[in-house]
Amino acid sequence: MAVADPHRLILTGENPFLRLSEKDGDPNSTDASYWRILFCPAGPGHVLYVKSEMTHGHWRIYSDNIAMARWLQQTVQGMLNAELKDTTIPVIDASFSKSGDPRYFWTEHIKAHDADIAMTWYDIGEPLLIHTEPNQPPQNRQYGVCTVLVPAMGARLTINGNQARGTPWKRDREGRPFSTCALAFSESWTEAR
């Protein structure tokens, strides 16, 4: 028997991410959160939030829907990373494309007036399905999520042909092999009614 989630659906799409560092346990030298949104109150679109030594340690935001990028900052992305609640960070207009086969590798391409960016995940691990409810202990996050996470033991970020320092690091998640870098497909976020 099917069960409908009792919470309000606020977005669905994809949210692959990169968290690179030069040594395991060091602060991230690159932190990148990429969204391909199919549905949310501010409409569909793409956005990349990225901070790296290649951005001089400052957040850069690239999007093809500024309203969606700002809505994410005020909701889910702002919850995931409080630094991104700052809606004074400029949003740079960009175009987006993808390539690859997620069983082997995946690349997201972002082009803007000042940057040609590629994010690539490879050495792909076994997918896992995660489902949390809004305000569920122990994290007590305001929003719940249902997503297919695909860990990547290899990943890189390039901006204008230069590769960011750092690598992904192995982690465990729910007792399964995971990484600091992953693809996140079929991702839906909910809030309590």
List the model feature ranges, each with a label.
Residues M1-R193:
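Targeting-peptide/extracellular-domain and disordered-appendage signature
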